[in-house]
Amino acid sequence: MSFVGGGGCGGQDVHKFVEALQADFKTLSLETKKKYPQIKEACEEAISKLCTAGSSQQNSVYYTVNQILYPLVQGCETKDLKIIKFCLGMMQRLITQQVVDQKGALYITNALWTLMENNIEEVKVLQTVTLLLTTNTVVHGDTLAKALVLCFRLHYAKNPTIVNTAGATIRQLVSLVFERVYLEKDSVSSLQQQQSSGSPAEGEGGNQDVQTFASDAFLLFQDLVQLVNADQPYWLLGMTEMTRTFGLELLEAVLTNFSAVFHESNDFRLLLKERVCALVIKLFSPNVKHRQLPAPSNGNAPVPAEKPYFPISMRLLRLVAILIQKYHTILVTECEIFLSLIIKFLDPDKPAWQRALALEVIHKLVTRSSLIAFFCKSYDLKNHATNIVHDMIAAMGSYIRYSLINASAMLNGQQNGVANSLTAMSGSNQCGFMFRGAYLPLVATYAPGVSKAVYLEMLDKIDASNIPDSYGISVGHAILLDMTRSIGGVIQRTPELHPSHNTAVITEEEHKPLCLQLVNSSWSALLSAFIPLVETSIDEATTENILKAMQNYAALCGMLEQLQPRDAFIMAMCRASFPPHYAMSIFANTTQSDGDLRCHTRSGSQDLSSQFINSCSGDAGDFRPQIVAVGTPLPSASLPHSVMQAPVMLTNKNLQCMRAILFLAHNNGGILGTSWHIVLQTLQHLVWILGLKPSTGGSLQAMPKPAVEANVGIQTAVMADLPVLSQMLSQLFESSQYLDDVALHHLIDALCKLSHEAMELAYANREPSLFAVAKLLETGLVNMPRIKVLWRPLTNHLLEVCQHRHIRMREWGVEAITYLVKSALQFKHKTPLKENMELQTMLLSPLSELSTVLHADVRQRQLDCVLQILNTAGEILSFGWPAIIEIIGAVNEHHGEPLIRTAFQCLQLVITDFLTVMPWRCLPLCISTAAKFGSQTQELNISLTAIGLMWNISDFFNQNQDKLMSTQLQDVSILPDFPGTVKMPQFDKLWMCLYAKLGELCVDLRPAVRKSAGQTLFSTISAHGSLLNPPTWQALVWQVLFPLLDNVRALSSSASNEKVDASGNILIHHSRNTAQKQWAETQVLTLSGVCRVFNTKRELLQMLGDFERAWSLILEFIQNAALSKNGEVSLAALKSLQEIMYHNTAERTERALKDPQTAQEQDEEIWTIAWNIWLSIGMESTKMSTSTSAKLQQQNSNGAETQEDFYIPSQAFLTALIQIFPAIFQHIQVKFTAADFDKFCTVLTNAVCIPVQTDAVPYIMSTVSDTLLTPLHDGILDCMELIQKEATKPDSHISQLIPAIFRQLLIFSKFACAPPTFQQSVEHKYAKSSGHYANNASVEVVSMNYIPFGEKSISICVKLYQTTATEDSVVQEQILHDIVKALRTPLAMKYKCLSSSTWKLAISSLISVLHTGLKVARAKPQHFASLWDDLADTLDKFLFPASVCTIEDRGLEEIVLDETIDCQVIELLRDEVLPHSHEMPHQFIMQIVVLLNKGSIHSASDTNICYESDWKLREIFAKTCFETLLQFSLLEDHANTNNNRLNANVLTAGAAGAGGKDFAGRLAVTALLHRFQEVLKRFNDDERQSGKCPLPRFRLSEISFVLKAIATLVVSMKKAPASKVNKPAWDQLIGLYPYLVDCTTTTSPEVSRSLREALLQYTDLLQAPRSCSAATSNDNVIQSNGQE
């Protein structure tokens, strides 16, 4: 092999490898330079070889490997450990790189051999050998043999590490040699050719000609056999030592892993047969001859044979197991010998470990069904061969029986010299077997089909450890189970999980004889082994496994029609289900002959069984099975009297056996044949003992025992298993459906026989067993597909049972018949029962025959059956309806309520489910019958359910309309007549019949019936009314619905108001505790229902005529209900009205398009009616007059009175009323007049003033928060906005309503500050509120939050004004004045407002309307003369409110924001008023100037103000006022002419009649100077009085502001024209100078800075300006007036 092929490396890797080799050789050269010059020279030569190689370095290394190996071999001969290690490492590297050829491999092997002989680096040597053989295949033949011998030699060294390493290496290399055989395709054929040319290698050396991998493997295996046989090897020359155990292990490994080699090669096969088998038989000799006998009493022991050696025997058995498992097809005779030997190893005289090993081998073999099949085919089926299968199972049975008897004998000390290791069982949860007190626990458990050896795996043990006494029976028990499983696998041809390639093939022809032989060879031996195991097992799991095996085996026998083995196993299981004496009694008269069974099933275990039975009643210390159930014996003719008297005690094992029988019969009922009787007899006894009684469908359930049966009981644990047993019983009879007809008749005959026996006992007044009747029922149920086969015999016997005088027998006879009839009718037969009259008649015949039975209970059960038939199979009763209805109709009231209830249930099912299969003519009768049940008064639930049935009928009519319409009834007399409608179709008459009957039930005396009937009536009309012809609708409205409304109204008004008697357990809610309240509910239901129908079919009714009359009538009904004193009725009426008003459909539009004029006229008429009805409802319901208020107050004073005397409409009612208006308004807006609007506003105002009752709080609170509008308020404002929107449209018909809209909104806006009172609705619109109803604590009403409502009204008003300010009606009606007056209230209250948002909204609204309105006022002053005083007063009261606000109340940020709002007002005056003063009244301008003066100096505005808390922060406001004053009084405007005109106007309009052109301006300056003087004087006085204590900060800020203002004023006066400032003003300014000087003593830096600015401005005033030397007398007058 070349390097390239082996390494697969690239050129670069090769180059690196060569360099590494050169480096290693250089290192080796240096190491051997002195001591080993010849190695040094060889290294240098190797280096030169590597250096001088050609360009193909890969081939160079391979071709020069032998030269470069030379120094390495020499190095290994030096015995220098360091050099040897280095050389071995280089060798391993060369081997790894696969550059070593055969010659090189020989060199390496020789070198390693030398190291081995010198005991140097043994581990490294083994590693190198492993590498040499595993990395390539160049080593074979003698070189391979030498390498293997080398490893064998090291395996027997003294160092344990080397021994273990060498052992592992040998195992690996031996496997490697055989693995190579698979790689060589022609190895087998070459060996076969060699065989044909000459005899196989027997002599020394073996075959030397063929150097193949197969020959290597052959020679190796041959020598291993030689070495194990203590002979000299032929090929492995140089072997000095070889243990037999190691050789056997190697042989086992080869035979286990490479069986294909032996199967495919004749040489290997011959070697196996002639050498290996002979070796095994030879080595087995000590095991066969040795016997373990007890020591004789005289002490003279015979000379023992050679004693078997455990390690050899164990390995031999492992080898035998492999030979049998893998090579049985080529070693047939040898395997027979091996199996016979293994079976003999189970003899009692063999050592315990030898028996244990044999058991483990047998277990390995029996888990493979293919092996069992091969054994039977090769041995048991042959005439002169050993019956291996039979002998194996018989040996197991003998071994198990011996184990049990021996354990008991050892426990009782009957065997001398044997140590007693068995003790009585101490725990209760043990697994195993117990015989006569000797306990054999299960020490080994196995998964099914899996063997797990213990002693066969003790490869490291010299001797077997102590084997537990119960180990053998544990393995033997598993062997029997797996043997049964394997036999089943053979018979059923179940594939193995892990099949081998050499498994014997069983053909179809061979299979049947093989299976029969298997059963014949195994059944008696298996049964004789199973019986003692069942009898002695003490745990459920073990017993379960054994019983499963017995079930499976019995089933297999049945499959093969082997009756004797089948019956033997079934009988054994049945006997095990009872205590022994009871079993003997009940099976004494069994017709089945069990003589043969006795010879097979009890021969080996009869004594054992009797011993075991006796042991149960032996000494007190013995094991006693736990009794789990005690019951009375089933009365039977076969039971002796003694047995009848004693209770039957069942153990858990008995119940397990019962389950096993059930399982067997369930899964394999077809093979029972004549055994059915014994099986059913067994089950009947067990069912009786356990107390299982039949229940529905024939299944059995546990029933409580009578208290008198003190000696009878079932443990709790078993009670939980009883349902499982019952289910298994049911499943057993369910499986009868898979039996053929003959087998089924066998089963029914057996059940009938048992039933006759029970009937005979019942005639003797003894409690009968109902098992047979129940199971006849179950059998019939599961065999419905072939019901004709068994119906006659089955039902005839059951009818006979129904006539029995014993009530239990009779009950179950009826139960069985009725259940069978129901099931048969429900079953889906091949020919559908609906079409099979013969079968239907046959099935209903037994039910009809029951009518001849006189017993009342039978009649009840018959009716129940009819009910259930309807419930389950009514749709197929195509031929049976007359009979069914006849049975239902035969029941009348004298039969009693139960039968009436049952009859109604039948009717209910007929109507609900089976109308489709009934004749057409039955439908009116069904309606009448249902209505009759609805009106009956015996049972309310029946009445309600009957009404539900009428809905079902309507649903049926709808779904089958086509079919019903197409069917014409000949006898029309069964349909009622409806006058007034010509030629009403039969289908419509059917509907009208239904509606009329429901309408009658709607006025029943019982509220529940009325409610149900009403709901059904309207649901039916809503769902199916579209099916009626249009003329029929008129009949429905005028003959059903309107009469219904009238009847309900009349009955409601006449209903009693006394409380209903709530006797009994029925709780009646307070809202329904009188007849009147109950009728109110009916009124709500009927009115809403009729309105909904009317609304839905409005277009149809309009086309039929009389619509206006119908419209008026239904609105009258609504009005009557809406004005009801019952809140529920009134609210429902409004909802109905709302539904009608909001109705608008495409049909209406289409009708208007077809005939627009007629449609319009009709619409106007009906909507005028609707408006009048709405107005009437609104006026009447919201009329909270003084008398009503007085009643409410009277109720407060007389607390005991009820609120029944008067009625306060709820918020929901008012909200609904208001929300209806938009729908009406869109139709009447063209005719909407001012009078209509006034009435509408009256309704709105009254609705707002209605007090809110406490029970309405959840309604309000669930929809709004404190900051949102209530639904009522929201609806009112929506209506106002709707009218406003229409009024503001161009060319609107109602534009004249705009002023009225303003006034109504302003009325609402006042509620933000003054909530309404009771009387407000009848007082003047602007009357002041005299109080609030919330103040009356005893009134059960709550205060409403009107603030959002009032504020929203203000906002709407402002928006409306902004869009309509210039309208003539708005100007002429002085709406702006009204708005100002309305806003004056919140603005004057300011901080006293309920919410700060109110006055903030008011001032922002005022600013908004003034921005808009002042322009209009200037344009049309004649309409605004009355505005100005109120406006000035409003501004003054807002800017200087009487209410007090502190930082503690509102916080600093809020006060700053408030001051900003005040400044906005001043800015409005500055921008919108003062620039246009010439266009406004003089008095108003004077009031504005006074207001600005008042605000400019805050400390001088009011001497009584608390500086600490209120006005200390209004500096910005004061500054704004001051700057506005200055701008107005002194500074030049950009338009001089405007100012002159303004001043002239002021003078002209002056009240005193004497003033100059700048009168207002000078007045402002004089007032300012006077206020400055007051502030300065007060500051100086306070500072002197305060001493060293500084004044408060706000005082310092105030004086600082005044000083800055003085400085600003001086500058402004200097710049102002002379005409604007007179001499007294200058004198007054100079007069301030002394006060300024007094301020110089202040310690405040802020004041000092401001003071300095003011004093600096006085520089130019030290001498009065000449321009002011002359002052007029008029100025003096003005000055004096200003100072005053």
From Swiss-Prot:
Q: What keyword terms does UniProt attach to this protein?
A: Protein transport, Transport
Q: What is this protein called?
A: Protein MON2 homolog
Q: Which domain of life does the UniProt lineage start with? A: Eukaryota
GN (gene name): mon2
**GO annotation, cellular component aspect:** endosome; Golgi apparatus
The answer to keyword Transcription applying to this record is: no
| Recorded GO MF terms | cytoskeletal regulatory protein binding
What does the similarity note say?
A: Belongs to the MON2 family.
Q: What does this protein do?
A: May be required for traffic between late Golgi and early endosomes.
Mind telling me which InterPro entries this protein's record contains?
ARM-type_fold, DCB_dom, Mon2/Sec7/BIG1-like_HDS, Mon2/Sec7/BIG1-like_HUS, Mon2_C
GO terms under biological process: actin cytoskeleton organization; pole plasm protein localization; protein transport
Q: Which PANTHER family match?
A: GUANYL-NUCLEOTIDE EXCHANGE FACTOR (PTHR10663), PROTEIN MON2 HOMOLOG (PTHR10663:SF333)
